[in-house]
């Protein structure tokens, strides 16, 4: 028998591979497993996430459900045992329904059903592993939302069983094989970014690039790529980088955003040669508008917004398209005054009303806005649009190469038309792809709505893709720079996963993040060490075993310690376990309440024991007054769908819950941490201090590491 697995399948056939490894480890057979870097093994078969080829058979069996049933038929002693086959296969059916289900309500009902079934059971059927267990485990593992929900602890019995399954050799081997296969696939594909892509007509020492943010929000990571790319080419050709604020819309802009953008640019390590403002050129731009009208290339129009949108869509000329030049000039004068007549009008470029490219259908180039400008006050009442102002200021400031994201592709002909119409100096437009991420909104309008509706705490919310948001979540500036540079100046439009983003950060923080200990305070178990120290005492231990430069921390030892409920649940009578950073101990007594929860333990130290021989290495904390209350906060993405399609409203895909709090007791060293310090809480992950200990508690935010599974199972 041989098994083939599609690495990119949704869902991935973890259960079938675990069964194959279970057979191999048991000695009942020898099954080869082949991993293919595809979404489907057979493009015509939507169920072909896995296939089984039986010896002597001409055609393979496709799909997780049929694969599990095949294992049960070929190896009944292993996967059915003494149990009722129909009962085992009914759970395989349930697993099939679970694997691809992302409906939150239906999923919750299924998980509750599984949890209830396990109240008095260790396994789904009988007293030994069956294909029922492997199928349910595989379904949970492949369904990120389901696996994440289990890890929240809401489904206590299911979480206990899931942890047990993760400890099985067949499962461990399966996950190691998948990780290895994925890494090999990535390595084969990765050739690194090509920074040898040059700019057209670039002359060393003469290249001028510009990064033109609008001061209407905070920089997000997409802007960061644009800024770093402009700096890259300016440096490559020993030229000049301009940071220019496109500040021609008083309705959206303010000095707070402007100052924040400058701070973020500095944090990114970007040093512009000059900072400029489009608003400094408003008089010059206005004169270009006058000249456009005089040359018959622009006209005043009072068509209402809805009618104009309809006419542009249908290719219908405005009734004012042939308005006399003098009349248009008079109306522009009224717009400059902000009069009633001026407010009803705009100025449109006279290009074409039926061009296949709708961006070219007589776009608006000037409009009124009576709101005070954050730099010029009420001096101006009419302002140019970005499409009109940008080529003018680019030309005036000597820009040689305008780097624009591919989303502007339809507007690039408009940019070139403006240059030609106003006899401006030639400027090269060079395209690059913007960075898009799964389950992430980068639209400034949508991000503003989310802030305004109170769905997040602000623009620096750790769930936000802003530079400030990812920094607050624990992304280092060094890692952010490395990641963006690693993407290269590609023009390929990709939707990126956050995995590599945070994995880059982990490489930076892991060698320097001090290690600390914490145990969940909910249902925490007190363990008495019968041969423990008579009185608590402290010893110096390294803050990071592989980095002595970080110094030492105080570790407190006592005869009463705290252990997490999940760890206590896994203990067996007289089992030898390892208390991390102390030594081995025997479990001499386990006390439970009526619900099955462990209420207390008695341990006996065995410090001469070999930690390499113990199955369980657990964290613990001395139950003394020095233990520190901490709120560990984890987050999920704001939307549930990887990529929103055209016309889809993000409000229909908001994640039900995106903020999760876990109260813990941590070691005394937490009290000395400052805001922004990054640590690793052993067996829990990396964290950044958001609120230092204030006498009551500290608040730490989880830092994704590219491997951990977040709430609802989302990989960050």
UniProtKB/Swiss-Prot annotation:
Short sequence motif named 'HIGH' region, residue ranges: 215-224
InterPro entries named among the record's database cross-references: aa-tRNA-synth_I_CS (IPR001412), Gln/Glu-tRNA_Ligase (IPR050132), Glu-tRNA-synth_arc/euk (IPR004526), Glu/Gln-tRNA-synth (IPR000924), Glu/Gln-tRNA-synth_Ib_cat-dom (IPR020058), Glu/Gln-tRNA-synth_Ib_codon-bd (IPR020059), Glu_tRNA_lig_a-bdl (IPR020061), Glutathione-S-Trfase_C_sf (IPR036282)
One MF term in the entry's GO annotations: glutamate-tRNA ligase activity
Cellular component, GO annotation: cytoplasmic stress granule; cytosol; methionyl glutamyl tRNA synthetase complex; nucleus
Keyword Aminoacyl-tRNA synthetase carried by entry: yes
Keywords: Aminoacyl-tRNA synthetase, ATP-binding, Cytoplasm, Ligase, Nucleotide-binding, Nucleus, Phosphoprotein, Protein biosynthesis
Superkingdom, taxonomy of origin: Eukaryota
Motif ('KMSKS' region): 441-445
SUPFAM superfamilies, per the entry: GST C-terminal domain-like (SSF47616), Nucleotidylyl transferase (SSF52374), Ribosomal protein L25-like (SSF50715)
Positions contributing to ATP binding: 220, 407, 441-445
GO biological process: cytoplasmic translation; glutamyl-tRNA aminoacylation
Residue numbers bearing the Phosphoserine modification: 190
Pfam family for this entry, one: tRNA-synt_1c_C
EC number: 6.1.1.17
Catalytic activity line of the entry: tRNA(Glu) + L-glutamate + ATP = L-glutamyl-tRNA(Glu) + AMP + diphosphate
Location(s), subcellular: Cytoplasm; Nucleus
Annotated residues for binding of L-glutamate: 210-212, 246, 386-390, 404
Subunit structure: Component of a yeast aminoacyl-tRNA synthase (aaRS) complex formed by methionyl-tRNA synthase, glutamyl-tRNA synthase and the tRNA aminoacylation cofactor arc1 in a stoichiometric complex. Interacts with arc1/SPAC30C2.04.
Record family assignment: Belongs to the class-I aminoacyl-tRNA synthetase family. Glutamate--tRNA ligase type 2 subfamily.
Function: Catalyzes the attachment of glutamate to tRNA(Glu) in a two-step reaction: glutamate is first activated by ATP to form Glu-AMP and then transferred to the acceptor end of tRNA(Glu).
Protein name in the entry: Probable glutamate--tRNA ligase, cytoplasmic
Species in which this protein is naturally found: Schizosaccharomyces pombe (strain 972 / ATCC 24843) (Fission yeast)
Underlying gene: gus1
